[in-house]
Amino acid sequence: LYKQGAILQPYLQHSDDLLVGVRTYPKINYSDVEKPIRSSNNEMFSYKDKYLENGGLEGSRRELPAKIDVLLKNQIIEILNNLLSILEIKGICRVDFLSKGNEVYLNEVNTIPGSYALYLWEHVGFSKFDLLNDMVNETKLKTNNWTNEGSDGTALKTAKDIQSKLG
């Protein structure tokens, strides 16, 4: 699988899912931490729980704000601050974590529309309209230094496998 590009991570038994909304305009803000409530006794927050039950994440049962220790919340904020300094995320995204005891692990960053979890912001006073308006305004004001150099896939096409590209 590694040669084909799959990333595998170990299963973290008896962990909880924690979700946080991130916005970068007009300044960096984080929503409250959400803890989704699983619809069954499953160990995992399943695809069915996340996207099919009750109309998806927005209609799912949750603790919002999550009843978590302040130290755990501070760890999440520290990870988010580091993440934003590294990835140059713009606009709105949802960041998913797993927690077990006093440890928190970054699981994924959801930057695609449909994964924004805009409902996370209503709890702290931002409507979906406010968020969309801020995203549009951010694109008008910010210039980026993105380039399409290397986007033709030449480097990957000439590599014998992904591992050789990663070093």
Where on the chain are the PLM-derived regions?
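Phosphate-binding site of ATP-dependent enzymes
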Residues: 1-59, 67, 99, 104
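ATP-dependent carboxylate activation and anion-phosphoryl transfer catalytic cores
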Residues: 67-167
